């Protein structure tokens, strides 16, 4: 639940954070030519950008971050791949042997896949972005991101910066994957992002505080620790039902007892009515009155 909330929150933050920069770009840096203007309006990578990226990919090697730099500053606004690559390389020395192997293999996997898939994809920006992020996820999973994160939790948390989540979608994808890597990794990432969010946005990060409190709270409370108000609310229906059954049982028993008592007196009255005289008639009227009260 908390993982879903955090993922939705950072995605929503990413959307709001990109509104103003996008509006500023349109007003201060208009497209230079009709071709670029039409490409941006249709959501396509311009022919010039396509040629530049293809040329860059041919000259870039599999080692390092050269391939990812080819996707910076394009009309589809695919950014963050180069930054996340540099972040991994700068922190590689802090990882253990398994973590270092993951960084080398994952970056090489992404570079190789981007070079071979880019020429086969449509120039539509949504298709290119989906291809880029899908390849990134596949390479992370193929080379076991979770195992590397579980053995290097502190380093992974240090790599995640809240401002990157607001500006670059590859970081959001990375965090969403880390949130599926077990409770220790998920809790560490959530706390780190929450603390950084509170420094930047203050009270707007209360949703993350609620999420973290849910992680720390036991799933169910013991009966003896339930609030008194809750126990009172729970006990009221029970008492009402119990009182209803007791009243019904008493009424039924009283009715049956009164009937048997009445029949007994009727038989006795038939046998000795002449001997009782006025007192017998008075007792009979009293019993009739009690019987009527019970029936009411």
UniProtKB/Swiss-Prot annotation:
One biological process term in Gene Ontology: intracellular calcium ion homeostasis
Region (Disordered): 22-44, 236-296
Keywords carried by this UniProt record: Disulfide bond, Glycoprotein, Hormone, Secreted, Signal
Residues listed as glycosylation sites in the UniProt record: 73
Cellular component terms (Gene Ontology): endoplasmic reticulum; extracellular space; Golgi apparatus; perinuclear region of cytoplasm
InterPro entries: Stanniocalcin
Biased composition (Basic and acidic residues): 238-258
Pfam short name (any one): Stanniocalcin
Tissues where the protein occurs: Expressed in a variety of tissues. Strongly expressed in ovary and to a lesser extent in kidney.
GO molecular-function terms, A-Z: enzyme binding; heme binding; hormone activity; protein homodimerization activity
Superkingdom of the organism of origin: Eukaryota
Main localization category: secreted
Similarity comment: family membership: Belongs to the stanniocalcin family.
PANTHER family hit by this protein: STANNIOCALCIN, STANNIOCALCIN-2
Record protein name field: Stanniocalcin-2
